[in-house]
Amino acid sequence: MSFIDSLNQLLFPTRCFGCAALGLSICSNCRCDWHPHYYKTHISQLNVHSAVPYSSTASRIILASKENGLKGADNLIINAIFHVLIKADFVNHNIRLVPIPSSPSARRRRGRSFIVDITKSVAQRSGLPLSDSLELTRRVRDQSGLDATARAHNMQGAFALKRGAYPRGDLILIDDVVTTGATLHEAARALRSAGFNPIAAVTACLAQPLR
């Protein structure tokens, strides 16, 4: 460990993302809430494969990654998504990973496109190619607090293919969490309407039941 790393550890000791206990990025108690398994759900014409049920621990991990860019939280999400790709037997097939894009305002605020960055790391680990093909075509509301009907209306027609994008082969959408499925449904619709083939989605978390 370098001097800088040692100093950082002294000034900013590792704490559990779930409960803030010192020592590990996720403690043994919170690991019960973030222990990748394999869950399969279905929305519209899309199978959704997920790793962990959404919980307060999962929420804190996602926020630590999404809003604070903490590498330890990134790694937990990357590991969960990679776990599902293995369990669903998507690795070693002619499949491309398509991340759900952040809005322009979120990219400016966070300094990155959260799921695009996560998917890049998943692609490197899995050997599956990344196809950053989608973009938001208009401003959408924050989905937290919206019910299923409001989320569907909020996301309707929100995605389109980027200019020049041509995501060949079978496509897997990647996102952090599926709640009602509105975002994944619209992303899949945008790909299908352009003649491409989204066959499934993979998320780190899923709400139970889908709301």
PLM features per residue range, with description:
Residues 1-211:
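Glycine-rich phosphate/pyrophosphate-handling loop used in enzymes and phosphotransfer proteins
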